């Protein structure tokens, strides 16, 4: 995994792949678990990535694996931990900023993990399509941090995908996008479609 990240960021070694992270960071790893266990990031890969982030000197209690709901994480096989453990893991569970903010064409309340808690973000999704936006390679994952994603699916999510991600809460903190490609889906997403 370290070698893959090193190649993706153009650095010569797995050790150099830790460069995007600093010991003082609070790192949020936003998963995409909407499709349940069969089409979500594999627990083993997520935990290997947590180890990579920790090896950069980030305290494990400052590594937050999160999704829009604890229920989705549990359905994908993750254990909810708001304290202790090798890393924190929980859903935002409707804990939005009290006031909306805007970015381009969108106005939304963002999850506190991206607005105030985390100083560095990682999108960790799976290789799959979305029936309206197509394949976004992790960009659509960020719809899970706004309170009203249903409003932003028109015109194949254009320009809304870009507007959500270019908000300073995300654009100023996004260090990596990682996709689990062990299981891929090219039609029928975002839910798991066995056909």
Task: Please state what every model-predicted region is.
Residues 1-26, 34-47, 51-195:
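Extended, low-polarity segments enriched in aliphatic/aromatic residues
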